[in-house]
């Protein structure tokens, strides 16, 4: 019978074992899907934009729509000045979106013959969130100097509560990588577990009850199909939310004064 353990899909397996200087540097299924996500994204956009026709074909139209969508998001959130970060935000959005979508396919030409959702691992989302956080700090200090500290001193706050507000602002800023990463990780993890659980119901009922089990499995199968459609939407929304929050945080580096 098929393995219905909902957690097994998140296991990291070594594909090519490698060790150097006492460190395990093995190429894993997680590494494979990171590379695949990067290569697939580059290839798709190269193919889509190869013609650069005045009247775009479907692939070019999709690429231009995505480009415009992200550009509008950056402009509306971080202002015209924020467009200097467009390549950064666009790369994050596309990488997360493609990674999320790849994880939606149960079987894939990959090690172990099944897909792997890299954004369902906290270490990956934390790395992405830390990249954003450090970018905000480095650019904010570089552009504003000590003026970057205005971020922690909101204007118009009464002096007698200002110390408390400053502490709250600092805690909020320091905790950004955690909230930024956990939101993406938790949504992708929970969604894939639910899909696996309902799909497992169908397999278990069919194996245990035979023909009657197939009839009993119609309800969980319908739920699994509905959840799959919802999960595709969540995959897009989580990429959008991560990119949107990135724009908001970058706006703090550009304009630290409240």
Swiss-Prot record:
What keyword terms does UniProt attach to this protein? ATP synthesis, Cell inner membrane, Cell membrane, CF(0), Hydrogen ion transport, Ion transport, Membrane, Transmembrane, Transmembrane helix, Transport
Question: Which cell locations does it reside in?
Answer: Cell inner membrane
Q: What membrane topology does this protein have?
A: Multi-pass membrane protein
The species is: Maricaulis maris (strain MCS10)
- Enumerate the PROSITE patterns for this protein: ATPASE_A (PS00449)
A Gene Ontology molecular-function term? proton-transporting ATP synthase activity, rotational mechanism
Q: One GO CC annotation, please?
A: proton-transporting ATP synthase complex
- Transmembrane ranges, per UniProt, are 30-50, 85-105, 122-142, 151-171, 198-218, 230-250
- Protein name as it appears in the record: ATP synthase subunit a
How this chain assembles, per its entry, is:
F-type ATPases have 2 components, CF(1) - the catalytic core - and CF(0) - the membrane proton channel. CF(1) has five subunits: alpha(3), beta(3), gamma(1), delta(1), epsilon(1). CF(0) has three main subunits: a(1), b(2) and c(9-12). The alpha and beta chains form an alternating ring which encloses part of the gamma chain. CF(1) is attached to CF(0) by a central stalk formed by the gamma and epsilon chains, while a peripheral stalk is formed by the delta and b chains.
What InterPro entries does the database record attribute to this sequence? ATP_synth_F0_asu, ATP_synth_F0_asu_AS, ATP_synth_F0_asu_bact/mt, F0_ATP_A_sf
Domain of life the protein comes from: Bacteria
Family named by the database record = Belongs to the ATPase A chain family.
Q: What does this protein do?
A: Key component of the proton channel; it plays a direct role in the translocation of protons across the membrane.
């Amino acid at each position: 019978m098929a393995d219905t353990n909902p957690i097994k899909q998140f296991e990291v397996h070594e594909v090519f074992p490698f060790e150097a200087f006492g460190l395990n540097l093995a190429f894993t299924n997680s590494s494979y899907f990171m590379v695949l996500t990067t290569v697939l994204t580059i290839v798709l956009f190269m193919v889509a934009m190869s013609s650069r026709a005045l009247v775009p074909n479907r692939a070019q139209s999709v690429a231009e729509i995505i480009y415009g969508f992200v550009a509008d998001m950056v402009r509306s959130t971080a202002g015209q000045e924020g467009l200097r970060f467009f390549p950064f935000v666009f790369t994050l959005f596309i990488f997360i979106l493609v990674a999320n979508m790849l994880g939606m396919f149960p079987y894939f030409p990959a090690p172990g013959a099944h897909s792997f959702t890299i954004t369902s691992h906290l270490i990956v989302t934390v790395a992405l969130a830390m990249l954003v956080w450090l970018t905000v700090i480095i650019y904010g200090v570089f552009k504003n100097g000590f003026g970057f500290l205005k971020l922690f001193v909101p204007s118009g706050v009464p002096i007698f509560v200002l110390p408390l507000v400053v502490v709250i602002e600092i805690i909020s800023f320091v905790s950004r990588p955690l909230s930024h990463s956990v939101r993406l990780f938790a949504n992708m993890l929970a969604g894939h577990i639910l899909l696996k659980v309902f799909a497992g119901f169908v397999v278990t009922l069919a194996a245990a009850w035979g023909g009657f089990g197939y009839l009993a499995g119609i309800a969980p199968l319908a739920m699994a199909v509905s959840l799959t459609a919802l999960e595709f939407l969540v995959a897009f929304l989580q990429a959008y939310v991560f990119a949107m929050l990135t724009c908001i945080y970058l706006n703090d580096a550009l304009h630290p004064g409240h």
